[in-house]
Amino acid sequence: MPNHQASEQMLGYLYQVRYALALLLENDNSDCQISIEKFDDVAFSKDHIPIQLIQLKHHIQHQGNLADASTDMWRTIKVWLDAISETPDILDGTNFLIITTATAPIDSAAFLLKKDSNRNPDTAYEKLKTVCFSSVNQAHQRYYDAFREAGEDTVKQLIRQIYIIDCASNIIDVEKDILKHIRYSCIPKHQKMIYERLEGWWFKKAIDALCCDMPVFVNQNQVRSFIVSVSQEYVDDNLPIDILDIDDLQEDNFSANEKIFHEQLKLICLGNHRMQLALRDYYRAFRQRASWVRNDLL
């Protein structure tokens, strides 16, 4: 039986990385820096100081909930209150965002924290305070304890700086959002290939950052430079080189043509190291040509 909860968690992690790329491309400040899982799910920083902390909520199997007593809402508030407890200065000039695929119910605290004409942080605070002091949900008690212990002034200041972005693109649709930023860099038939290379590069950046103890920042100019560089490979008088490396070759896995080439190399008495290099180049060339044919570039 498939574990839908595990699948949804995995999608949530992938969504976090993909949506971070979309956020970076959409940002009006080309010098902005973004980090993943350092200050928060995603964070924008200036001079290595967070100016926007972002929690991402993705729901597929189960419809998300942003009601006043929802887990998504209260768990996030506790995360931010814990961060404020450790670094009180974080409240100075930092915005806190919840970006979710769910919909904020009308007149809920989340609805009143959207960036529109209905925004009313004071009323949102009162709604959350009512839940905090009246709820008997034992699973949420640690969230309510953090709310009460932080003090009214701190919680009110936090809530004034919270912004809810609901009905966000899901993990499939956010790909379309990213493609909108690529389409002006190339002709339409190459958009998907450039997107795939961009996302491969981006996911590697994210993995490297997650494996590093120190915060790793990527700015918008780096991403745009990569898009421009890759797009220049997809022009009428050029064939892109996108097969950059292959795994170690095992003779048992060779195709018939590769075995013939291998035997030919033996006949000219190449050493093992040079033979491996020749086989790797041969295999890369074969895969590269197959890629060009598959993508209709020849």
Where are these regions (language model features)?
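Acidic metal-coordinating catalytic centers involved in nucleic-acid phosphodiester chemistry
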Residues: 1-9, 58-298
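Catalytic centers of nucleases
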Residues: 5, 9-10, 14-78, 82
